Structure formats: structure tokens, C-alpha cells
Amino acid sequence: MPLLLHPAWPLLLGATLTFRALRRVLCRLPLPAHVQTDPLRTWRWHNLLVSFTHSIVSGIWALLCIWQTPEMLVEIETAWSVCGYLLVCFSAGYFIHDTVDIVVSRQTRASWEYLVHHVMAMGAFFSGIFWKRFVGGGVLTLLVEVSNIFLTLRMMMKINNAQDILLYKVNKYVNLVMYFLFRLAPQAYLTKFFLQYAGQRTLGTFLLSILLMLDVMILIYFSRLLRSDFCPERAPSRQQKDKFLTE
């Protein structure tokens, strides 16, 4: 079947438009006082609200997929389910939406790391969407969204200058645990799989290269997280205060 006629395109378009519509709805919600006076923080707040919603839905969805099809934990290349396939399409639609949102809002320079991540994620997901291979790997990758629930909540509190409240202090420890369980652990497991098996195949080699680049990004983000929450500077500079854009 020609790629342009693939039935997955309506699913991707529908998911992308869903997130676009969601953003319009969320933009009507009241803004926190520390956010509404700054256009950059306002855009970032709305962007994070969409991300937060995606993380909740996709994180729970990924856990449900693995519960329904546990062989995805082992048969990473061949395991397939309707639930998992729709999840990968849904999340790919989010990454398309967020990429367009960043570019249209002229936040490319401030959010270039997100763009790099989104391009790599979409490249990996498309192998499952258009060739129906490694759908299980895509679902395992999306376990990271469970961690992103707490990571996004952390960033939203930082934007709102709420680092001193109890919720932030509790969340930073929960966030650390979730980072290990749902980000570092699945990523290490997938990397081991692709190094041993899939790296010998053409598509597997492509996905392995993406995975290794994501490994580097995840470790960099982890070091930033530790430094920001557990080894903060006493008198942060203006540049440090604005790091909510990438941290």
C-alpha cells in the first residue's frame, strides 16, 4: 500500500486536531497571578497544560496496554494490539501538535531540545504506525508519560514560583522515584534489547540510533533535575530563574 494512502493518516490527523482543540479549551482557563503578567510564561503554561493532559491519558493508557498484552514486555518487535496501536497514533499526534505549536509561537530557540526530542520520537513511532513493527517498543517507551505527570507538575509549579509549598517538596521526591521506575528503567531495558537483537536489522539499527540519542538526553535531563531540586544555588541568576523553559 502506498504510504500516502495508509489508513493511519486519518488517525494521526484526528489526534493532532484533538490536541489543537484541547489547547483552545485550556487557554480559556484562569491563569495564576505569576503567569498572566508574562507572555512567555503564559504560552509555556498553556503548553504544559496540554502536555500534562497527554501524560495522564498516555501514561494510564500505556499501563493498560501492557496489562492487556503482557507479551509486549518480551516480544518488543512483533507484539501488537489495537489498544497499543491507537496509543502510538495518539501520542504521535500530540508530538505533531506540540512541534507545530512551538514553531508557530516562535519558541523554537527556547524549546529546541523539545523539538529534537519530538522529531526523534515521531521517527520511532512511525515504524509502528506505518509498518506495524515495534508497537510493543512504542508502548514501553510511553511508560515515560507516567513519570512526565510529576515532571510536568513540577515545571508548572516552578513557573508559578511555588517551589516553597509542601506539594512541590513532596512532588520532587515522588518525581525522582517515578523518573527511575518509568523513565530510566524502561529506557535501559529497551536499549539492552536493541543492542542485542534489533541492532542487526535495518529498521532496528535506525531505532537503536534514536534510542541512544534519547538515552543521552534523558541522562542530561536527570542531571539537571538533581542539580535543580537537590543542589540548588543560593542566589540563582536571571538565567537560572528562567530555566523552567527546559527544566
UniProtKB/Swiss-Prot annotation:
Which residue ranges does the record assign to the TLC domain?
40-234
Which ranges make up the Extracellular topological domains here? 28-46, 105-123, 145-173, 223-247
Task: List the subcellular locations.
Answer: Cell membrane
KW Cell membrane (keyword) present: yes
Which residues are the signal sequence here? Answer: 1-27
The protein here is known as TLC domain-containing protein 1
Q: What does this protein do?
A: Regulates the composition and fluidity of the plasma membrane. Inhibits the incorporation of membrane-fluidizing phospholipids containing omega-3 long-chain polyunsaturated fatty acids (LCPUFA) and thereby promotes membrane rigidity. Does not appear to have any effect on LCPUFA synthesis.
Supply the Pfam families for this chain: TRAM_LAG1_CLN8
Q: Which organism is it from?
A: Rattus norvegicus
Side Cytoplasmic, residues:
68-83, 195-201
- Any S-S bridges, and between which cysteines? none
Q: Which residues lie within the membrane without crossing it?
A: 124-144
Query: What does the UniProt keyword field contain?
Result: Cell membrane, Membrane, Signal, Transmembrane, Transmembrane helix
Q: Which domain of life is it from?
A: Eukaryota
Bilayer-spanning residue ranges: 47-67, 84-104, 174-194, 202-222
PANTHER family to which the protein is assigned, alphabetical: CT120 PROTEIN (PTHR13439), TLC DOMAIN-CONTAINING PROTEIN 1 (PTHR13439:SF5)
InterPro entries given in the database record? TLC-dom (IPR006634), TLCD (IPR050846)
Name the membrane topology term: Multi-pass membrane protein
What SMART domains does the annotation carry? TLC
Biological process (GO) annotations?
Answer: membrane assembly; phospholipid homeostasis; plasma membrane organization; regulation of membrane lipid distribution
- Name one cellular component (GO) term: plasma membrane
